[in-house]
Swiss-Prot record:
Keywords: Chloroplast, Electron transport, Heme, Iron, Membrane, Metal-binding, Photosynthesis, Photosystem II, Plastid, Thylakoid, Transmembrane, Transmembrane helix, Transport
Species per Swiss-Prot/TrEMBL record: Cucumis sativus (Cucumber)
GO cellular component, one term: chloroplast thylakoid membrane
The name this protein goes by in its record: Cytochrome b559 subunit beta
Purpose: This b-type cytochrome is tightly associated with the reaction center of photosystem II (PSII). PSII is a light-driven water:plastoquinone oxidoreductase that uses light energy to abstract electrons from H(2)O, generating O(2) and a proton gradient subsequently used for ATP formation. It consists of a core antenna complex that captures photons, and an electron transfer chain that converts photonic excitation into a charge separation.
Subunit structure of this chain's protein: Heterodimer of an alpha subunit and a beta subunit. PSII is composed of 1 copy each of membrane proteins PsbA, PsbB, PsbC, PsbD, PsbE, PsbF, PsbH, PsbI, PsbJ, PsbK, PsbL, PsbM, PsbT, PsbX, PsbY, PsbZ, Psb30/Ycf12, at least 3 peripheral proteins of the oxygen-evolving complex and a large number of cofactors. It forms dimeric complexes.
Cofactor(s) needed by this chain: heme b
Chain residues that bind heme: 18
TM region(s), chain numbering: 14-30
Record note on cofactor: With its partner (PsbE) binds heme. PSII binds additional chlorophylls, carotenoids and specific lipids.
Keyword Ribosomal protein listed: no
An example Gene Ontology biological process: photosynthetic electron transport chain
Amino acid sequence: MTIDKTYPIFTVRWLTVHGLAVPTVSFLGSISAMQFIQR
């Protein structure tokens, strides 16, 4: 019973972490690419 309540929270947290991490990585990638182009 406790596992059923903890599992959805864990998956939502996992999705939130990935949803925030993916744009951050692409944002950093674009910044590094612009730095490369300027040099």
